[in-house]
Amino acid sequence: MQQFDVVILGAGSAGENLANTLAQGSKSVAIIEEHRVGGECGFVACVPSKILLRAAEVRLLLHEAHQLGAVAASLDAGDGRAAYARAVARRDAIVPDDDGFGAQQFADNGVTLIRGRGIILRPGVIGVGDDELGYTDLVIATGSAPTVPPIPGLDTVPTWTSDQALTSPEFPTSLIVMGGGAVGCELAQIYAAFGTAVTLVQSAPQLLPQEEPKIAAILADALRANGIDLRLDVEATKASRTDDGGVALTLKDSTILHAERLLLAVGRDPRVEGIGLDKLGITPGEKGLETDEYCRVRGQEHVWAGGDVAGIAPFTHTASYHAKILTANLLGQHKQADYRAIPRAVYTTPTVASVGLTAAQAREQGYTISTAGVDLRDTARAETEGTTHGRLELIADKARGILIGAAAIGPHADAWLGEATLAIRAEVPLDLLSEVIRAFPTFNEVYVEALDQLRGDGD
């Protein structure tokens, strides 16, 4: 049996980064991957979705060309099906077919890559097929998979998960998107921009239920303007196959929706089944494995977790951050994770971005807060861009005079919210933030009025 200092289950963003840095730190490392090195982000999620979202954004901008004075009359975006085929061809040209690059990095760094499914056999031993590997420390980084909701009849109708949609060349003429989170909103806008008749069904009263209501409402208006039929605060109760092979989805209010296909975007589940956690006495929670501030699985001395399976925030950048924390701790440096400023982004047009706590979350946690909100239309940059959809909201802890949350919607909001991300992480005083000189004309100017509101006590 081969013995390693560290064995990692899963070569996604957390596992891949961790394996390479640990090996460079003179640890003997084996990493076990059942699918592809690099995880889902680069192959079936983040990267292909952003390629298609960029194409969708350009098509939407064509409708604004006349308003901006760029052309004499409104431009026709042309046949959506043909355009989608071209966008898919570009997607497939950019997204790699295999994981050769990642596998070669492992080889260059001395990481042992083992293809297959790793299962915990007993403390200190992992099985892969007929082989056994010994470890001193085990890192579980198995990621997550799209949630399939328990709706009667779902197995009889043509469905996609988000992973399947983002790798398929198929262009449906009509589509029901189930789920109004980040993935559901992005995919709904992609297909609508190319001409698909899209209906989005969301069980919560608003889109993006974890975000500020005013931000979510602005996004809802934008999606409706794209022709997307939003059905909010309603659940699906039954699915059935129509005579023409499509979908009939029955809602709780007895409405029946029809479409060529149903796209499931209701969340993701941590991959914790069938990997032998019971052999270590580990019982996962609904969100995954519970970890301490060092990314160690609670109740375990030599078992760690990172990425989606740790249940903190299901983002690639969180997984990469976990890799840094895990590297430090497995090398004996005792570094604690700090999750106060994990940015979130929804790459729709307009873009939604947020960081830290919402106002509701802050109040629930006992903070006495002040809040501020400013529309982007109050900035010169919004005038030059012809932007009508946009807003910044800030949440401050009154007692300490620092930001603890921020949310934004507007062009490139993911970029200009970086100022708030840094301010929250570094606990920059509001007085100091107010003294920052911001270039004119930029969207960052919206911070000036918002910070003035906070210093004047906001709400």
Which functions belong to the PLM regions below?
Residues 112-115, 119-127, 194-293, 298, ...:
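A Rossmann-like FAD-binding core segment of flavoenzymes
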Residues 2-4, 21-27, 32-171, 199, ...:
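Glycine-rich flavin
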Residues 1-12, 171-181:
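Beta1/beta-strand and adjacent pyrophosphate-binding region of the FAD-binding site
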Residues 155-171, 256-329:
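FAD-site-proximal beta/loop scaffold in flavoenzymes
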Residues 48, 126, 270, 297, ...:
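Hydrophobic "anchor" residues
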Residues 19, 23, 188, 192-193:
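Gly/Ala-rich phosphate-binding loop of Rossmann-like dinucleotide-binding domains
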Residues 7-9, 118, 133-143, 177-178, ...:
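Short hydrophobic core segments
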Residues 7-35, 40, 47, 51-58, ...:
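Flexible, glycine-rich terminal cap/loop adjacent to redox cofactors
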